[in-house]
Amino acid sequence: MNNSKDNPFRGAIARKARIYLREGLDCVYFLNKAGQAEPCPACTSLVFQGKTCEEHIHNNNLLSWQVVRQLERQTPQRQSSN
């Protein structure tokens, strides 16, 4: 199921992500290097198998739904210049 030599926390991250999805998130989110919530549709489908995608194997910065909502409120929305 899980290759623990990749990241021993990968299964735990997947379990936590499943909880966050049940609590209202539509996608799994990780904190990116710019400090923004980054959705990962690949992880969203893989967490139900106890895995994360290859890009996020070593990323333990899983965001809860509360943090995602807070970051969305803090990030100013871009307005088009049309």
Swiss-Prot record:
Origin: domain of life: Viruses
Function per UniProt: Involved in host translation shutoff without degradating host RNA. By suppressing host gene expression, facilitates the evasion from host type I interferon immune response.
Protein name: Host translation inhibitor 5b
InterPro entries: Acc_prot_5b_avian_CoV (IPR008458)
Gene Ontology biological process terms from the UniProt entry: symbiont-mediated suppression of host gene expression; symbiont-mediated suppression of host innate immune response
Pfam family, one: Acc5b_avian_CoV
Source species taxonomy: Viruses, Riboviria, Orthornavirae, Pisuviricota, Pisoniviricetes
UniProtKB keywords: Eukaryotic host gene expression shutoff by virus, Host gene expression shutoff by virus, Host-virus interaction, Inhibition of host innate immune response by virus, Interferon antiviral system evasion, Viral immunoevasion
UniProt keyword RNA-binding, yes or no: no
